[in-house]
Every structure is written in structure tokens, then in C-alpha cells.
């Protein structure tokens, strides 16, 4: 650990500020976090020491429980900004989200830090039998008017129907009678442009996440331009914290993603928000169970302390073997070079 400074994502995979603040603060105390790669299961550790972290990018639907932690994190010298999701969706899609609390907390963050520290995520947009064009115009207008002066950027996208999301939508139709409507690109472009016009009225710039056709579609005469989103954005970090300049690399996580390279320390299937559209959970029950059973002292979020300690020992053992191998290689090269220098 400590060889390379990283941008740390906290987290796309779960809501750490809302539910796992104690775990995260314990990770800062110990100076590292364990990660299980979601594809392949490789286990590794990443340094969270201040000198090894470029910036934390915090993601949440509820920063309320994390506010005091943020003060401590700030005092420790870390840099950070926020991706704050406030969608305006009906509770049938977000049963455990307190929207008014989210609105007030976003304003508090803006006052404490600055509007430039916050990406407001109006994401995802789901066109359904209860959420049509008129619904979104009204819901977005209400939120944009609330956030005028508190944010400068709004990131949005239309819902991506991954297989697990499709299953949830099918259950929603069977149990609640809510039908998801598959709209064409022309409809989506027109709605996005209307939202961009509302945003501009309140001094907010719209950014399209993984939807370049919406950026192109905003070039219609009479509408404000929609820009390409970079949810983890090296240029935002540079403008906030590094006036002397910052080197960073783009590393998309999926098609048309504009994100800067980062390391995510979250774990899938651990978020108890229970949002129907979530791609990070297989099902609500599994996520609730993971949250109920989580160990704040484990290095790996969502896993037991016993598992964590075993994996840390294995990683350390592997690292020790690797260091010995490198040392032997260097020694061999050095001996060879000395021999060559002899007359």
C-alpha cells in the first residue's frame, strides 16, 4: 500500500454514507480497505492514508447520518466531493428514501462546502404508467427551484434495464400494477431538452450520464446545451483542490461513460435502500441481510471479521513472497552486473 495516489469512489456499489459510516471511519483509522473484485473475486487492499488519496468521491441518497463524519474527514486533511441522488420518483420506486431530508441535507452540504462540491443526480428517469412527461416536468421544476443557488450541475440518465432490473420491474407490474414504458430516443431527447431549459432557468447545467445521443440531441435550436457527464471527474477535483494542475486518466466503467479512473471500495448486494431500479442488488432480502449482519470491524465491507482477517493474511503472505522474489531478481541482476564490470 502507499505506492500510488488514487481517487477513491465511496461508492457506486452501495450507499456507504447512509448505512456504513462507522465501517468507513474504521477503515480510515486503520489506513486501508479490502476489496473483493465483483468479477472474478480477486481480493486486494487499497491504502486510505491521506497521502495516498487524491480525493474521495462520495455517493449517497442520504448524507444525513454522515455529516459529523465529514467534519472529521475534512479535519484529517482529505479532499472530497459529492454525488447526491435526489430523483423525485414516487415511493413505489424508492420505498426507503426520505426525499425532504435529502433536499435539506443537500442544502446543508452546499452551505458547508460549496455548490461546486455537489453533483445533483436526477437519476434515473423511468418512464412508466405513473411517471410520464408531465410528471417529470413538474417534479424536476420543484427540485430545480429548491436547489437554485445550491448546485451548479445536474447529472441524469434514463434507466438501464439490466437483467436484474427487468426482473424487479416485472415484479412491480405484477404486485403494484405499475408498467414501465419503453420510449423511443426522440421522446427522450425532447424531454431531456425540456429539463435542460428548466435547469438553465435556475442556473443549473445539465449533464447526460452514458447517453451521448442526448448531448447531440441538445443541439436543437432554442434549447440549452446538455454536456457529457463525468460522475467521477478529474477536472472537478482539479478545479476544487489542485489549482497547480492534476494528472488523471479517463477510465470508463461502461459504454459512453466519461469517468476518470478510480478505485471503488463498496460491495454489491449490501444496500438496504431497496430501490426497484437498482443494478447493484440481486434482491432486497439479500441486501437487508447483508446490512443487518455487517461487521464494522471487517476490512472488507459486507464480510465477516473472520473472513476479512483470513484474506488479509493471505494477501500479506502473497505480498511477502512477491517482495522476496523481486529482491532475489534484483540481487541476481546486481551480481551479474558486478561480474560484467570486472576486467
Model-derived regions: residue spans:
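Conserved Radical SAM active-site core
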Residues: 1-93, 99-115, 283-321, 333
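N-terminal [4Fe-4S]-dependent radical SAM core
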Residues: 1-9, 17, 49, 222-268, ...
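Flexible, acidic/Gly-rich N-terminal and inter-domain linker regions that tether
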Residues: 4, 182-244, 292-294, 322, ...
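Active-site beta-loop-alpha junctions enriched in small/polar residues
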Residues: 13-15, 61, 85-89, 123-125, ...
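Conserved C-terminal portion of the radical SAM core fold
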Residues: 101-168, 194-211
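Local cysteine-cluster metal-coordination motifs and their immediate loop/turn environment
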Residues: 263-282
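Short, basic, low-complexity termini and linkers enriched in Ser/Thr/Gly/Pro
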Residues: 317-343
Amino acid at each position: 500500500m502507499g505506492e500510488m495516489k488514487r481517487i477513491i469512489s465511496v461508492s457506486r456499489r452501495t450507499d456507504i454514507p447512509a448505512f456504513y459510516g462507522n465501517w468507513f471511519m474504521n477503515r480510515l483509522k486503520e489506513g486501508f480497505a479490502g476489496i473483493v473484485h465483483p468479477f472474478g473475486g480477486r481480493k486486494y487492499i487499497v491504502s486510505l492514508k491521506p497521502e495516498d488519496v487524491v480525493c474521495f468521491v462520495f455517493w449517497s441518497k442520504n448524507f444525513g447520518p454522515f455529516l459529523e463524519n465529514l467534519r472529521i474527514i475534512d479535519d484529517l486533511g482529505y479532499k472530497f466531493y459529492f454525488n447526491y441522488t435526489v430523483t423525485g420518483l414516487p415511493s413505489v420506486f424508492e420505498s426507503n428514501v426520505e426525499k425532504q431530508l435529502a433536499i435539506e441535507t443537500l442544502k446543508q452540504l452546499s452551505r458547508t462546502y460549496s455548490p461546486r462540491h455537489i453533483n445533483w443526480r436526477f437519476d434515473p428517469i423511468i418512464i412508466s404508467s405513473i411517471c410520464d412527461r408531465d410528471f417529470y416536468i413538474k417534479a424536476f421544476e420543484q427540485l430545480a427551484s429548491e436547489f437554485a443557488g445550491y448546485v451548479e450541475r445536474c447529472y441524469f440518465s434514463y434507466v438501464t434495464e439490466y437483467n436484474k432490473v427487468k426482473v424487479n420491474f416485472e415484479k412491480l407490474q405484477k404486485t403494484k400494477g405499475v408498467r414501465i414504458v419503453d420510449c423511443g430516443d426522440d421522446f427522450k431527447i425532447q424531454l431531456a431538452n425540456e429539463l435542460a431549459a428548466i435547469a438553465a432557468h435556475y442556473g443549473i447545467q445539465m449533464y447526460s450520464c452514458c447517453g451521448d445521443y442526448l448531448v447531440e440531441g441538445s443541439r436543437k435550436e432554442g434549447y440549452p446545451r446538455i454536456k457529457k457527464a463525468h460522475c467521477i471527474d478529474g477536472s472537478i477535483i482539479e478545479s476544487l483542490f489542485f489549482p497547480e494542475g492534476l494528472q488523471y486518466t479517463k477510465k470508463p466503467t461502461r459504454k459512453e461513460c466519461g469517468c476518470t479512473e478510480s478505485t471503488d471500495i463498496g460491495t454489491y448486494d449490501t444496500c438496504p435502500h431497496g430501490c426497484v431500479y437498482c443494478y447493484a442488488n440481486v434482491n432486497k432480502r439479500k441486501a437487508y441481510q447483508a446490512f443487518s449482519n455487517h461487521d464494522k470491524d471487517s476490512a472488507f465491507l459486507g464480510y465477516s471479521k473472520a473472513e476479512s482477517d483470513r484474506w488479509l493474511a493471505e494477501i500479506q503472505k502473497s505480498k511477502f513472497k512477491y517482495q522476496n522474489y523481486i529482491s532475489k531478481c534484483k540481487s541476481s541482476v546486481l551480481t551479474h552486473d558486478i561480474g560484467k564490470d570486472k576486467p
